[in-house]
C-alpha cells in the first residue's frame, strides 16, 4: 500500500515539474486564462515549390502547412522578454500547424494580463533563427533555400485590449524572386551558378512589412550557388531558372553546357558578359523580376548580349 502511495506521489511530482518546465515564461509574467490563438494569411502568389492555393483571390495555406512564430513581451515598465519560442530551442519560433481550418500549437501560451506582445512569423518553419539576446532575425541562404520563397509576418498586440481575439498575421514576401530565362540561342544548358550572400539579418520591417535586411562582413563572404540539370526548366524556347535571393546584386554568373559521359560541362561563351550585365541590376526584397537573356547577332563575326529586366506583379 505504501509503495502505491509513494508511486502516486512521485507521478504527481513529475507532472508538476513538467508543467513548471513548459510554463517558465508564464510563471515569470502574470498571465490570464485566455489562450493565444492565430489567424494567418499571405499575399503569396503561386510560385514553384509551394502548396499554397488561390481561393477567390485570397491566398490560403493548405492542411499540415507549418509556420514558426516568435513572441516577445514588453511590460508596462518596458522590460522585454522572449515569450513564445520552440521547446528546447529558444532561438527558434514555436511551430504552428494548419489543420485545414485553424492554426494549432502545443503547449498553449496564454495572454499576459498587461503589456504588449510582438509576434513574428516565418514560412517555412525552419527558415529563420533568432539571436540569443536580441530581436535580430537571421536567415541563412543556400542553393537549397533559394528554391523556395521566404514569408515574413508581424503583428503587435496590446494584451489587455486584444486577448479576446485571434492574432491576425499577414505574411509578406521577404526575398527577391528572380526568374532567369535564357533563350535557345545559348544551346543546351546543363548548369547555372552564381555567387550569393551566405546570410542576411534584420530587426525591423518597412511600412509594407518587408524586412529591412542588413549584412555583416561574414554574411557577404560569397558562396557558389550551383543549380544542376534537374533544377532547370526547359522548353522549345529556351531554359529558365527561378531563385529567391537576398536583396542586392547577382555576381559571378556562369553557365555550362550539358557534359558528355565522363566529362565536365564546358563553360558557355558569353557567361562573363552576362555576369557583367547582371551586376548592374539591384534586386529588391519583396519584388519579383523577369530576366530575359538573348544572344544578339550584331554582324557576321561577333555577338552581343541582349538582356531585359522587368519587375512583374504577382
Predicted regions and their residues:
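Bacterial N-terminal signal peptides that target proteins for export
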Residues: 2-10
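Outer/extracellular conduits and scaffolds centered on Gram-negative outer-membrane beta-barrels
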Residues: 10-15, 174-176
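C-terminal motif of bacterial Sec signal peptides marking the signal peptidase cleavage site
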Residues: 17-20
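Short, conserved catalytic or interaction motifs in soluble domains
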Residues: 23
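Short, low-hydrophobicity acidic/polar segments
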Residues: 27-188, 193, 228, 235-259, ...
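Acidic/polar low-complexity flexible segments
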Residues: 187-233
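Short proline/glycine-enriched turn/loop segments at secondary-structure junctions
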Residues: 278-282, 300-302
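C-terminal, surface-exposed recognition/capping segments
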Residues: 298-314
Amino acid at each position: 500500500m505504501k509503495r502505491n502511495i509513494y508511486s502516486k506521489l512521485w507521478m504527481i511530482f513529475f507532472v508538476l515539474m513538467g508543467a513548471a518546465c513548459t510554463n517558465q515564461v508564464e510563471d515569470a509574467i502574470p498571465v490570464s486564462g485566455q489562450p493565444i490563438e492565430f489567424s494567418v494569411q499571405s499575399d503569396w502568389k503561386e510560385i514553384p515549390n509551394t502548396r499554397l492555393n488561390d481561393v477567390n483571390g485570397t491566398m490560403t495555406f493548405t492542411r499540415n502547412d507549418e509556420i514558426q512564430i516568435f513572441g516577445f513581451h514588453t511590460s508596462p515598465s518596458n522590460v522585454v522578454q522572449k515569450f513564445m519560442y520552440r521547446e528546447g530551442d529558444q532561438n527558434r519560433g514555436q511551430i504552428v500547424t494548419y489543420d485545414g481550418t485553424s492554426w494549432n500549437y502545443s503547449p498553449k501560451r496564454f495572454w499576459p494580463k498587461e503589456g504588449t506582445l510582438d509576434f513574428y512569423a516565418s514560412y517555412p518553419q525552419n527558415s529563420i533563427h533568432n539571436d540569443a539576446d536580441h530581436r535580430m532575425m537571421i536567415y541563412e541562404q543556400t542553393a537549397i533555400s533559394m528554391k523556395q520563397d521566404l514569408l515574413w509576418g508581424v503583428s503587435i498586440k496590446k494584451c489587455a485590449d486584444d486577448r479576446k481575439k485571434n492574432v491576425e498575421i499577414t505574411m509578406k514576401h521577404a526575398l527577391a524572386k528572380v526568374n532567369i530565362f535564357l533563350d535557345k540561342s545559348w544551346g543546351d544548358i546543363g548548369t547555372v551558378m552564381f555567387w550569393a550572400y551566405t546570410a542576411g539579418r534584420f530587426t525591423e520591417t518597412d511600412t509594407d512589412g518587408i524586412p529591412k535586411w542588413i549584412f555583416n562582413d561574414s554574411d557577404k563572404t560569397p558562396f557558389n550557388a550551383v543549380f544542376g540539370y534537374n533544377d532547370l526548366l526547359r522548353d522549345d524556347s529556351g531554359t529558365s531558372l527561378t531563385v529567391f535571393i537576398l536583396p542586392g546584386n547577382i555576381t559571378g554568373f556562369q553557365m555550362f553546357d550539358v557534359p558528355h559521359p565522363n566529362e565536365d560541362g564546358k563553360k558557355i561563351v558569353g557567361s562573363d558578359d552576362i555576369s557583367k550585365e547582371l551586376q548592374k541590376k539591384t534586386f529588391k526584397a519583396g519584388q519579383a523580376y523577369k530576366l530575359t537573356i538573348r544572344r544578339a547577332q550584331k554582324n557576321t563575326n561577333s555577338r552581343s548580349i541582349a538582356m531585359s529586366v522587368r519587375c512583374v506583379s504577382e
